[in-house]
Amino acid sequence: MAVAGSWQPPRPCEVYRAEWELCRSVGHVLHHYYVHGKRPDCRQWLRDLTNCREWEESRSAEAQRSLCESEQVRVQAAQKHTLVWALRQRPPTDWNLPLPQEKDK
C-alpha cells in the first residue's frame, strides 16, 4: 500500500485542461457533431480539472475520490467496445499459395 501523502492524480492537471480545451474547440465540436449528431459533453473534463486543482491546493479527499472514479469510468468505457475483426488462432492453410492470375481478355 502506498503512503497516504504520496498519491498523485492519474494525469497532471495540465492534461485535464488541454482535454477540456480540445473538447470545446471548433474542429472537435464539428467532428463530433458530424459523427454523433450532437455536441460533445465537456463537463466531465471540466469537473476533472476542477477536482485536480482542488486536490493540488487542499489535498481534498473528495476530489481524490472523484478523480479516481472518473478515470475508472473512462478506462471501462474504452474497454467495452468490441473488436471489429475476429482474431484468428492460426493462419489459413493456403496462405502461401500463389495468387490466382486474372485474365484480362
UniProtKB/Swiss-Prot annotation:
User: Its Gene Ontology biological processes?
Assistant: negative regulation of long-term synaptic potentiation; regulation of synaptic plasticity
Q: Does the keyword Ubl conjugation apply?
A: no
GO cellular component annotations of the record = synapse; synaptic cleft
Key words, A-Z:
Secreted, Synapse
> Which InterPro entries does the record cross-reference, listed alphabetically?
Pants/Emi1-like
PTM info:
Rapidly degraded by proteolysis following neuronal stimulation, resulting in increased AMPA receptor clustering.
* Subcellular localization: Synapse; Synaptic cleft
**What Pfam families does the annotation carry?**
PANTS-like
Q: Where expressed (tissue)?
A: In the postnatal brain, expressed diffusely throughout the hippocampus at a low level at 8 weeks (at protein level). At 16 weeks, strongly expressed in the stratum lucidum of the hippocampus (at protein level). In developing and aging brain, expression is strongest in hippocampus, especially in areas CA3 and CA2, throughout the dorsoventral axis.
What protein family is recorded?
Answer: Belongs to the UPF0545 family.
PANTHER family annotated for this entry? UPF0545 PROTEIN C22ORF39
Q: How does it assemble?
A: Interacts with RTN4 isoform A/Nogo-A; the interaction results in enhanced RTN4-mediated inhibition of AMPA receptor clustering. Also interacts with NCAM1, RANBP2 and CCT8.
Annotated function: Negatively regulates long-term potentiation and modulates adult synaptic plasticity. Stabilizes the interaction of RTN4 isoform A/Nogo-A with its receptors, inhibiting clustering of postsynaptic AMPA receptors at synaptic sites. Upon neuronal stimulation, degraded at synapses, reducing RTN4 signaling and allowing AMPA receptor clustering at individual synapses.
Q: What is this protein called?
A: Synaptic plasticity regulator PANTS
Q: Which organism is it from?
A: Mus musculus
